[in-house]
Amino acid sequence: MRLLTVSLIAASLLLAGCANDDASTITVSAASSLTDAFTEIGAAFEEQNPGTSIRFNFAGSSRLAEQINSGAPVDVFAAASTAAMQRAVDSGSVETPRAFATNSLAIAVPLQNPADISDLTDLADPAVTLVVCDSPVPCGAAAWELFAKNNLAIKPASLEPDVRAVLTKVVVDEADAGIVYRTDLNAVVGEVKGIQIRDEVNVINEYPITVTTDAKPDARSFVEFVTGNDGQRILQSWGFGRP
């Protein structure tokens, strides 16, 4: 199973350990929806830059911004929305970001689709156990924007800390449906059924990336790689759009 979950304990230990890394290790804090694409990008970057290692911390963008603003030793921040990135910008923790990808929402349901969901409007049924990201997280903010845009009165069964937590609940049949990013469906092919949302009623998130104000020198090279041809090719292979 390609689905990767990162516990808060693991993330805390990771960030604490980064303080002792040498200059050849770049710490990248990235939105959980970037897990698969960035893992592949990191491997490609390391292959092209012998001697440089990439260490990832994947979590909800809002939590990552809080960690960075609190002084966590991070070199690169890639968020799932401009709003989450702006929190780090406003605190002076990061340099000016640039957009590197776009993403939109989809509905994930168990393979057997027990609630017989076929459309966005089906999620308004009180009998449907729906899980979404908490609103401070970009996937949550986007979900509530989606509901408002389509005049849907939604009462989720639970609010999750990041999009991969939402996806996990669907994978293990603890929910009838979850609002995730389209790209997340590529990580669980054969484990969930994806229901696409029409573009005209969907919500598109723009993903920004930047280095922190005290980033290691090679951090800029990683950002250039992500925004360059190789990085963009990998992102598109996972379903991300160009900015």
Give the residues covered by each predicted segment.
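Exported/periplasmic ABC-transporter solute-binding proteins
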Residues: 18-47, 62, 66-69, 81-82, ...
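Periplasmic-binding protein-like
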Residues: 75-79
